[in-house]
Design a protein with these regions (language model features):
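Pyridoxal 5′-phosphate
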Residues: 1-133
Length: 133
C-alpha cells in the first residue's frame, strides 16, 4: 500500500476540514479576480486573448493566448527570468483548443491556490507586461 500517499491524503483532508472549503474558495476567487483585472488592462492593447468564459465559477485556472509572441517563449521567459512556473500547450484538451482556435500554439495556463499570495499575482502581471513591452 502507498502509505505516504494515504498519509498525505489524510493531512490534505484534515487541512480542508480545518480551513473550510468556503475560505479556500474565497481566497482562490480573490486571486483569480485580481489576475483577470490585470489581464483585462493588457488585453485592451490586443496583446493577449483569454479564451473561454471568464464569468463562470472558477477553479483558479486561467489560460491565455499571447497574440504577439509565441506562447512557449512567454512560458520559458516567465520561468527563466522571473521564476514563475506555469504550463504551455494543449493541457490534455485538444478539442477544447480547436473550439477556441488555439490548437496550433495552445495557451499558457496559470493556476492559483490557497497558498498563493496577492503579491505573487501582482508580480506575475508585472512580469507579463515587461515581457510584452
Amino acid at each position: 500500500p502507498n502509505i505516504p500517499g494515504i498519509y498525505g491524503l489524510e493531512k490534505a483532508l484534515q487541512f480542508i476540514e480545518e480551513t473550510g472549503v468556503k475560505e479556500i474558495q474565497a481566497h482562490t476567487n480573490m486571486l483569480h479576480q485580481r489576475f483577470l483585472e490585470g489581464l483585462y488592462e493588457i488585453q485592451g492593447k490586443n496583446l493577449i486573448r483569454i479564451p473561454g468564459k471568464e464569468g463562470r465559477e472558477n477553479s483558479g485556472v486561467v489560460s491565455i493566448d499571447f497574440c504577439t509572441m509565441d506562447n512557449a517563449l512567454v512560458c520559458n521567459r516567465l520561468a527563466s527570468r522571473y521564476g514563475i512556473m506555469i504550463r504551455q500547450g494543449l493541457h490534455c484538451a485538444p478539442i477544447a483548443h480547436q473550439c477556441f482556435g488555439t490548437e496550433k500554439s495552445g495557451t499558457v495556463r496559470f493556476s492559483f491556490g490557497f497558498f498563493n499570495r496577492m503579491e505573487e499575482i501582482d508580480r506575475t502581471l508585472l512580469a507579463i507586461q515587461e515581457i510584452l513591452s
